[in-house]
Amino acid sequence: MKKTDFRVMNNQDVELEFDGKAIAFIKSRKADHKIHAMAEEMIKMALDIGIELTDVIVDGGANEDIDRGSITDFCQTLDKTGAVVVFVDNIFSFTTEPDDLFKFIDTLMNRPVLLVDMEHNHTWA
């Protein structure tokens, strides 16, 4: 899949029933209660579409490189759970480097998973 092949949809276009599990990725250095609030919002959205959010990976570091421990943990969790939906607080939580981000999204889309950006209300399928 090439960069231009991604479909960006608003959440109104997303199929509301899924068969499988979901995981979440949050990059934040905010207080724990704020991180828990973000996770609760993701859990609620998962339940609303009839899917169980099993794991939330939190990256509290300042590093934005794609080759960091929290991304490795995320990928291992995705493999382990076989999740079909990935919630992320902001798509740029994975990395702010455009080429790395496109490659990473491309890797996710080859699984396939539905990627949900909570901050920008976008999904990628």
Where are these regions (language model features)?
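Short, structured surface patches at the beginning of a domain
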Residues: M1-A125
